[in-house]
């Protein structure tokens, strides 16, 4: 559905959507109804705030961009709810025997999840959970909630699953991921370490732990990244994480080794920029100016904003105390 960018029309659609959800609340279920109403209310509030800002000031690119985001979210939500209500009508027309089969609801939820219809998946998992409160369903609901950014609620269901089975891998991983997304590093580390107790070779958990330790303890971070890399030796993302962690630790020769390894794996343009910029800076730190300039020349072939590169070079020379060289490149910015 294409929503035209008009405040009154938008609010009218949002209120119609809200009324439609409330009218079908018995079919949708209390929890899912509250979630949908909360999403609609947030959009109404934000749309009003942005429209008020635009009416007071001349529209700028930022406010118009924010408004476009609201319309995009509204279009997506409208389609999701419309599809959900349509699917509910079809699903509830099933035979009485099928409606009482939790596995059927689980399968319908899995299918919806696969198609990224997360509200529909939640509806089906809710129906399945009414019939069977097993750990698999609790975790499936938790992951569907994560997809909808309902992290607090997701934690509630992962915890329920964990209470039933303290060593449930999916529940522990879900808790680790939920806390990671909430920037609660302490709890995220706690649960990902529990995941590793169950499976020391879980690459995702190792990578998450590397990222969680990166800011506070690079030595621990590098250990986790390298363990993950042993299991996925050609993963360029992991190779670069190892390289950048060594760079942060000022272990420049180790960092170069991994940046060079990444270059052999056909990195994309964004990765190439990161690699050549980092290698150029490292060679300056090591006093190997010729190699540094070679890297920055390659960077110039990728990044057309050469003044940014000159500024990076100048700042790096300034960092190592070579003021004359820094001045040379600052002049190129003029």
UniProtKB/Swiss-Prot annotation:
<dbReference type="Pfam" id="PF13181">
    <property type="entry name" value="TPR_8"/>
</dbReference>
<dbReference type="InterPro" id="IPR019734">
    <property type="entry name" value="TPR_rpt"/>
</dbReference>
<feature type="repeat" description="TPR 1">
    <location>
        <begin position="102"/>
        <end position="135"/>
    </location>
</feature>
<dbReference type="InterPro" id="IPR011990">
    <property type="entry name" value="TPR-like_helical_dom_sf"/>
</dbReference>
<feature type="repeat" description="TPR 3">
    <location>
        <begin position="169"/>
        <end position="202"/>
    </location>
</feature>
<feature type="repeat" description="TPR 2">
    <location>
        <begin position="137"/>
        <end position="168"/>
    </location>
</feature>
<protein>
    <recommendedName>
        <fullName>TPR repeat-containing protein MJ0798</fullName>
    </recommendedName>
</protein>
<feature type="repeat" description="TPR 5">
    <location>
        <begin position="236"/>
        <end position="269"/>
    </location>
</feature>
<feature type="repeat" description="TPR 7">
    <location>
        <begin position="308"/>
        <end position="333"/>
    </location>
</feature>
<keyword id="KW-0802">TPR repeat</keyword>
<feature type="repeat" description="TPR 6">
    <location>
        <begin position="273"/>
        <end position="306"/>
    </location>
</feature>
<feature type="repeat" description="TPR 4">
    <location>
        <begin position="204"/>
        <end position="235"/>
    </location>
</feature>
<keyword id="KW-0677">Repeat</keyword>
<dbReference type="Pfam" id="PF00515">
    <property type="entry name" value="TPR_1"/>
</dbReference>
């Amino acid at each position: 559905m294409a929503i035209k960018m008009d405040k009154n029309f938008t609010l009218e659609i949002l209120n119609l959507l809200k009324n439609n959800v409330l009218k079908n609340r018995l079919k949708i279920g209390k929890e899912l109804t509250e979630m949908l109403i909360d999403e609609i209310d947030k959009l109404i509030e934000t749309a009003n705030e942005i429209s008020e800002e635009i009416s007071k000031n001349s529209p700028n690119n930022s406010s118009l961009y924010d408004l476009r985001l609201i319309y995009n979210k509204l279009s997506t939500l409208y389609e999701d709810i419309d599809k959900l209500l349509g699917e509910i009508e079809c699903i509830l027309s099933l035979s009485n025997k099928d409606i009482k089969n939790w596995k059927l609801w689980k399968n319908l939820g899995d299918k919806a999840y696969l198609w990224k219809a997360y509200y529909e998946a939640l509806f089906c998992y809710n129906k399945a959970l009414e019939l069977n409160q097993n750990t698999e369903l609790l975790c499936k609901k938790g992951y569907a909630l994560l997809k909808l950014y309902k992290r607090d609620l997701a934690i509630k269901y992962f915890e329920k699953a964990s209470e039933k089975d303290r060593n449930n891998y999916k529940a522990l991983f879900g808790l680790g991921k939920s806390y990671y997304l909430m920037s609660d590093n302490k709890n995220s580390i706690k649960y990902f370490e529990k995941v590793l107790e169950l499976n020391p070779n879980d690459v995702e958990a190792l990578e998450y732990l590397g990222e969680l330790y990166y800011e506070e303890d690079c030595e621990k971070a590098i250990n986790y990244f390298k363990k993950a890399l042993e299991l996925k030796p050609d993963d360029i993302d992991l190779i670069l994480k190892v390289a950048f962690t060594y760079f942060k630790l000022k272990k420049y020769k180790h960092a170069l080794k991994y940046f060079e390894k990444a270059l052999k794996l056909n990195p994309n343009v964004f990765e190439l920029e990161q690699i050549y910029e980092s290698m150029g800076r490292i060679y300056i730190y090591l006093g190997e100016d010729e190699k540094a300039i070679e890297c920055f020349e390659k960077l110039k072939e990728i990044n057309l904003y050469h003044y940014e590169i000159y500024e990076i070079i100048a700042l790096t020379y300034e960092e190592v105390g070579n003021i004359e060289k820094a001045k040379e490149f600052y002049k190129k910015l003029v």
